Amino acid sequence: MGKKKRSASSSRWLNEHFKDPFVQKAHKQKLRSRAYFKLDEIQQTDRLFKPGMTVVDLGAAPGGWSQYVVSQIGGAGRIIACDILEMDPIVGVDFLQGDFRDEKVLAALLARVGEGKVDVVMSDMAPNFSGMPSVDIPRAMYLVELALDMCKQVLATKGSFVVKVFQGEGFDEYLREIRSLFSVVKVRKPEASRGRSREVYIVATGYKG
């Protein structure tokens, strides 16, 4: 039996991926992923991270965001990261592998955070996409709602939240909820984010607690 041919869409995605200048740049600089550059651009405009901060990273693998934040918060800072996928260790990152939707995993994550509050919650979580927006968008919205729930449990007053959201049904309501909880809310589309993608990043600062 011959090898199954790739679909036209998957072949196009692979072609785009390897030609992407940010993918090439990440490879050249030995970075975990192109997501590093998305967060770098957000940091240049919104200044979320400072030395000594404690940060929660949801959907952390392969580690692009954690890798970036380590460079910003330094040795006195702390990152608690979680993903359903494996992630190679990063110095300064306390990584928990497990499904964030599972109550036991959530409890373990909260235990690692401890009694203190965190300065930033960030989420780059995304579901496995089927290609059907009617299925994919609700799955994605469920994940970002969980990320916001995490903020309500662990984020310090005046803390910050950055979350990847896919535009579609439920986006406007979600944005309204975030606006009610934070003093300043921006919607960013970093240059490293592909133009065809529905993804945007909500950057919220000044958590009202």
Swiss-Prot record:
Pfam families given in the database record: FtsJ
One GO location term (cellular component): cytoplasm
GO molecular function: rRNA (uridine-2'-O-)-methyltransferase activity
EC number, UniProt record: 2.1.1.166
Keyword annotations: Cytoplasm, Methyltransferase, rRNA processing, S-adenosyl-L-methionine, Transferase
Segments forming domain TRAM: 191-209
Predominant subcellular localization, coarse grouping: cytoplasm
Reactions listed under catalytic activity: uridine(2552) in 23S rRNA + S-adenosyl-L-methionine = 2'-O-methyluridine(2552) in 23S rRNA + S-adenosyl-L-homocysteine + H(+)
Catalytic-site annotation from UniProt: 164
Domain of life: Bacteria
Annotated positions binding S-adenosyl-L-methionine: 63, 65, 83, 99, 124
Cellular compartment(s): Cytoplasm
NCBIfam families in UniProt: PRK11188.1 (NF008390), rrmJ (TIGR00438)
Function description: Specifically methylates the uridine in position 2552 of 23S rRNA at the 2'-O position of the ribose in the fully assembled 50S ribosomal subunit.
Family membership noted in the UniProt record: Belongs to the class I-like SAM-binding methyltransferase superfamily. RNA methyltransferase RlmE family.
Protein name: Ribosomal RNA large subunit methyltransferase E
